[in-house]
């Protein structure tokens, strides 16, 4: 069967066929001469030995009219050319070859199309298609731009295709006829589906338009879509041109050769002959290029190097100590112990998952504890004030979006109180003044070597997962509980015994005091007349101070009546200690000294006798006897 090449895009038909036999050649020439006087151009292609015409094209003057397809065992009429019944019974068993009937004035070319379309051959089409493919350097740049766009916070709703079932939006496809997302654009770029930059931007615009049509132009998701579109357009403004300059092409080819040399295996050649060397060399190169893909080497980006330099460890040891303290405080806020109040603030807020479409309308600067922890670990803060500002921003966003009385609002208040408590607790470290002496000598070495120390301090005991250690810890806890119980039991026993002893001593003391107070009263009554006037006045003053105001002592000019029963025990003891105790001690000394000397005993006997005589004297001579007794007592003391 012969081949008919047709340019389907420009609607021109052309017949290219080779004669199959000498008979076919003669028929072709005869038919072309017969139709030389005809005004119409007829191209007939026959590709079947059974007499079936595959295609016929008719050009009536300068205009293209129609293309007819003929089937088996059917009769067709061509009104413009006067050809009828091509597949009649008389020609059913004839072998027809391709026939070309053209105008005599233009035997080698087709007439010009009224729309200005020109005839093109298949090699020209292939060349044009190759020229329309996206250059590798532009494809690579677009792919990196899409990946950078996916890393934005605003790009989260556009990373994956929209799932109407999971998001409970069954009417999504009523508004969106052509779904599009960033992952699909990235996949198409990796598969070399795009042939121009405009196709990529068109898909990106389709994704943004879908968002605006479904969510409305004033929605927070729509504003996120506009922001990532602005970012992507900014990336496109720095895209390299489609055709690189000659210097860039030479540099690219040089890099490719260098990569090929690096990827090619080591070849040991034998110096047998020049022919063998060439064969072996070409064979090895073909094997390497066809065996495995070449690895592309990507140079590090200047931005990454800038980040490494910018986020280096601070020189000041005091500042490092402050940041470690901040990290410890942050770990307390993020610990499982406080999970009942910290879980809404651990990760960035997802408005889609939490069904909060107006979140970014209220919160302009989102912040969370996880981001703050990452910034601390990577030394992104230069001062502790930046850390405090970000932490206060978390609480501010919470109070701004959640009204007072909301559960999340109360959680934020409790978490802020906890932070303030630990912050005040570590004021000694946080208020240390930085000096020049605590600067590290070599910043470059310290920024890498001291990271290990920082990591060691961050190790927590909760990270230990050894079962033997965990078993021993549990056993120690049980033993500590048992030890505390035993201590409590022993202390209760000791306290009971001590109370019992103290109670017995108290009862004995009370009994002894009862007897001793009676003895004191008796001794005071017996020796009250032995006091001098000065001592008597002091004793009366003590008694008056101890009595209440309404109690008045009954007194005459010469005598004062005192009832000792109305005095308390403390007053009686005080009177006795001040005025009568010394006298009793002196009397006891006299008794002891009387055992060894005879003179005092004689005096004592005389005194006693004198006192006995004085007792017989009547009341009228009482004062004289008192003076005599006082004189006798003075002589005894001498």
From Swiss-Prot:
<feature type="compositionally biased region" description="Acidic residues">
    <location>
        <begin position="624"/>
        <end position="638"/>
    </location>
</feature>
<feature type="region of interest" description="Disordered">
    <location>
        <begin position="1"/>
        <end position="54"/>
    </location>
</feature>
<dbReference type="InterPro" id="IPR036427">
    <property type="entry name" value="Bromodomain-like_sf"/>
</dbReference>
<dbReference type="GO" id="GO:0006338">
    <property type="term" value="P:chromatin remodeling"/>
</dbReference>
<keyword id="KW-0234">DNA repair</keyword>
<feature type="domain" description="Bromo 1">
    <location>
        <begin position="130"/>
        <end position="239"/>
    </location>
</feature>
<dbReference type="GO" id="GO:0042393">
    <property type="term" value="F:histone binding"/>
</dbReference>
<feature type="modified residue" description="Phosphoserine">
    <location>
        <position position="264"/>
    </location>
</feature>
<dbReference type="InterPro" id="IPR001487">
    <property type="entry name" value="Bromodomain"/>
</dbReference>
<feature type="region of interest" description="Disordered">
    <location>
        <begin position="586"/>
        <end position="638"/>
    </location>
</feature>
<dbReference type="InterPro" id="IPR027353">
    <property type="entry name" value="NET_dom"/>
</dbReference>
<keyword id="KW-0749">Sporulation</keyword>
<feature type="compositionally biased region" description="Low complexity">
    <location>
        <begin position="25"/>
        <end position="43"/>
    </location>
</feature>
<feature type="compositionally biased region" description="Basic and acidic residues">
    <location>
        <begin position="1"/>
        <end position="10"/>
    </location>
</feature>
<dbReference type="GO" id="GO:0005737">
    <property type="term" value="C:cytoplasm"/>
</dbReference>
<keyword id="KW-0677">Repeat</keyword>
<feature type="compositionally biased region" description="Polar residues">
    <location>
        <begin position="271"/>
        <end position="281"/>
    </location>
</feature>
<feature type="region of interest" description="Disordered">
    <location>
        <begin position="435"/>
        <end position="460"/>
    </location>
</feature>
<dbReference type="Pfam" id="PF00439">
    <property type="entry name" value="Bromodomain"/>
</dbReference>
<keyword id="KW-0227">DNA damage</keyword>
<feature type="domain" description="NET">
    <location>
        <begin position="506"/>
        <end position="590"/>
    </location>
</feature>
<dbReference type="GO" id="GO:0140566">
    <property type="term" value="F:histone reader activity"/>
</dbReference>
<dbReference type="Pfam" id="PF17035">
    <property type="entry name" value="BET"/>
</dbReference>
<comment type="function">
    <text>Transcription factor involved in the expression of a broad class of genes including snRNAs. Required for sporulation and DNA-damage repair. Prevents the spreading of SIR silencing at telomeres and protects histone H4, but not H3, from deacetylation.</text>
</comment>
<keyword id="KW-0805">Transcription regulation</keyword>
<feature type="coiled-coil region">
    <location>
        <begin position="468"/>
        <end position="537"/>
    </location>
</feature>
<dbReference type="GO" id="GO:0031452">
    <property type="term" value="P:negative regulation of heterochromatin formation"/>
</dbReference>
<comment type="subunit">
    <text>Interacts with the TFIID subunit TAF7 and with histone H4.</text>
</comment>
<comment type="similarity">
    <text>Belongs to the BET family.</text>
</comment>
<dbReference type="GO" id="GO:0001046">
    <property type="term" value="F:core promoter sequence-specific DNA binding"/>
</dbReference>
<dbReference type="GO" id="GO:0000785">
    <property type="term" value="C:chromatin"/>
</dbReference>
<dbReference type="InterPro" id="IPR038336">
    <property type="entry name" value="NET_sf"/>
</dbReference>
<keyword id="KW-0963">Cytoplasm</keyword>
<dbReference type="GO" id="GO:0001094">
    <property type="term" value="F:TFIID-class transcription factor complex binding"/>
</dbReference>
<dbReference type="GO" id="GO:0030435">
    <property type="term" value="P:sporulation resulting in formation of a cellular spore"/>
</dbReference>
<feature type="domain" description="Bromo 2">
    <location>
        <begin position="317"/>
        <end position="426"/>
    </location>
</feature>
<keyword id="KW-0804">Transcription</keyword>
<feature type="compositionally biased region" description="Acidic residues">
    <location>
        <begin position="450"/>
        <end position="460"/>
    </location>
</feature>
<dbReference type="GO" id="GO:0070577">
    <property type="term" value="F:lysine-acetylated histone binding"/>
</dbReference>
<dbReference type="InterPro" id="IPR050935">
    <property type="entry name" value="Bromo_chromatin_reader"/>
</dbReference>
<keyword id="KW-0175">Coiled coil</keyword>
<keyword id="KW-0539">Nucleus</keyword>
């Amino acid at each position: 069967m012969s081949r008919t090449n047709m340019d389907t895009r420009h609607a021109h038909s052309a017949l290219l066929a080779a004669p199959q036999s000498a008979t076919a050649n003669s028929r072709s020439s005869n038919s072309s001469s017969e139709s030389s006087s005809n005004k119409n151009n007829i191209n007939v292609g026959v590709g079947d030995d059974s007499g079936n015409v595959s295609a016929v094209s008719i050009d009536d003057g300068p205009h293209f009219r129609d293309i007819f397809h003929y089937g088996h065992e059917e009769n067709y009429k061509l009104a413009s050319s006067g050809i009828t019944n091509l597949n009649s019974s008389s020609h059913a068993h004839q072998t027809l070859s391709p026939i070309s009937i053209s105008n005599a004035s233009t035997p080698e070319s087709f007439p010009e199309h009224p729309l200005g379309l020109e005839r093109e051959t298949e090699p020209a089409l292939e060349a044009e298609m190759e020229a329309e493919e996206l250059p590798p350097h532009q494809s690579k740049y677009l792919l990196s731009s899409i990946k950078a766009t996916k890393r934005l916070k605003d790009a989260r709703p556009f990373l994956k295709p929209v799932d109407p079932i999971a998001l409970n939006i069954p009417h999504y496809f009523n508004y969106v006829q052509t779904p599009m997302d960033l992952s699909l654009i990235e996949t198409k770029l990796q598969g070399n589906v795009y042939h121009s930059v405009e196709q990529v931007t068109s898909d990106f615009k389709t994704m943004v338009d879908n968002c605006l049509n479904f969510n409305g132009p004033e929605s927070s998701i729509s504003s996120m879509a506009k922001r990532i579109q602005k970012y992507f357009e900014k990336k496109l403004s720095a895209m390299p041109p489609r055709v690189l300059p000659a210097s860039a092409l030479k540099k690219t080819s040089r890099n490719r050769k260098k990569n090929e040399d690096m990827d090619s295996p080591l070849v040991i050649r034998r110096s047998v002959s020049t022919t063998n060397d060439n064969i072996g060399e070409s064979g090895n190169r073909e094997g390497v290029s066809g065996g495995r893909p070449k690895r592309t080497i990507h140079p590090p980006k200047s931005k990454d190097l800038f980040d490494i330099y910018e986020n280096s460890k601070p020189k000041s040891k005091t500042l490092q100590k402050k940041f470690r303290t901040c990290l410890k405080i942050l770990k307390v806020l993020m610990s499982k112990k406080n999970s009942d109040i910290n879980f809404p603030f651990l990760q960035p807020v997802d408005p889609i998952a939490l069904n909060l479409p107006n979140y970014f309308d209220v919160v302009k600067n989102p912040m969370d504890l996880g981001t703050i922890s990452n910034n601390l670990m990577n030394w992104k803060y230069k001062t502790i004030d930046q850390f405090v500002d970000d932490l206060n921003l978390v609480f501010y966003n919470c109070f701004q979006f959640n009204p007072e009385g909301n559960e999340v609002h109360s959680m934020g208040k409790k978490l802020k109180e906890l932070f303030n408590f630990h912050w005040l607790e570590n004021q000694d470290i946080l208020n240390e003044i930085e000096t020049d002496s605590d600067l590290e000598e070599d910043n470059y070495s310290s920024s890498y070597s001291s990271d290990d120390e920082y990591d060691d301090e961050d190790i927590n005991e909760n990270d230990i997962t050894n079962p033997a250690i965990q078993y021993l810890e549990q056993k120690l806890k049980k033993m500590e509980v048992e030890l505390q119980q035993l201590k409590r039991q022993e202390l209760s026993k000791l306290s009971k015994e001590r109370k019992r002893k103290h109670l017995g001593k108290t009862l004995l003391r009370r009994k002894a005091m009862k007897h001793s107070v009676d003895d004191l009263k008796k001794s005071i009554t017996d020796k009250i007349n032995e006091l001098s006037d000065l001592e008597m006045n002091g004793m009366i003053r003590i008694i008056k101070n101890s009595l209440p105001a309404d109690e008045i002592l009954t007194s005459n000019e010469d005598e004062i009546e005192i009832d000792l029963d109305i005095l308390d025990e403390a007053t009686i003891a005080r009177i006795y200690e001040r005025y009568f105790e010394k006298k009793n001690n002196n009397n006891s000394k006299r008794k002891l000294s009387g055992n060894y000397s005879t003179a005092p005993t004689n005096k004592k006997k005389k005194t006693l006798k004198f006192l006995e005589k004085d007792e017989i004297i009547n009341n009228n001579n009482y004062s004289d006897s008192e003076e005599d007794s006082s004189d006798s007592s003075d002589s005894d003391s001498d």
